[in-house]
Amino acid sequence: MKSLKIWLSGLALSIGAATTAQAELTDILSAGTVKIAVPENFPPFGALGIEGEYEGYDVDVAKLIAADLGVELELVPVTSKQRIPFLETDKVDLVIATMGANPGRAKSIWFSSAYAPFFSGAFAARTLDISSPADLAGLKVGLTGGTLEDLELTESAPAGTEIIRFGDNAATRAAFLSGQVDVLVTGNTVAAGLSEENPDLDIATKFIIK
């Protein structure tokens, strides 16, 4: 069955006729199961809970979609780099993720309206004096590889910026907490979660990326 190629962050349809999308939806209903990709390690949107099941905001949205369609839900945990390939190879029908839209991605997928008040930004100690990408020279910047933050910062960071790419959100968070990087580039909800979990961590939004 062809993938319905949907992003829920920011329901998107694969580039093509609406009649094709309707046929793909019919396939999902006939199969009685919808395969939805969600973040494998990106709290609060998706992560493995203490009960051994995936939980989070995106997981809840996936459950609502399956219930609304009246089909069984098959959750497929993915990393940031796996999201588009899993759609393109029909491993999943939909992807629900905090993924920013850009012209390159829009060539193969359509984005829904954003479902959460989410933005990407640079976060660091309140005492670190930076306010734009131009101020990153000489600093170590941690982010998750293959994300929109990676694409945007690779273009805008000045010479002398050390961009350190990690395999998943958990590793990126850990690097910032341990002092391995000076600046954390991620979503505002991730930064808010870090502050909540670490009351002594005095971090601030330095600038917005997307």
What are these regions (language model features)?
Residues V34-K35, L69-E72, T89-A97, L139-K140, ...:
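Alpha-to-beta junction loops
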Residues A47-I50, A62-V71, S112, P133, ...:
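Ligand-binding cleft/hinge of the Venus flytrap
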Residues A124-V141:
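Flexible hinge/capping segments at coil-to-helix
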Residues R83-T98, A106-F118, G187:
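Short beta-strand-centered segments that line the small-molecule binding cleft or hinge
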Residues V59, E74-P85, I164-S178, T189:
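Short helix-initiation/N-cap motifs at beta->coil->alpha
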Residues A23-T98:
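Extracytoplasmic small-molecule ligand-binding "clamshell" domains
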Residues L25, Y57-D58, A106-A116, D202-K206:
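A structural signal for short loop-to-beta-strand junctions that line the ligand-binding cleft
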Residues A116-A124, N188, A192-K210:
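Periplasmic-binding protein-like
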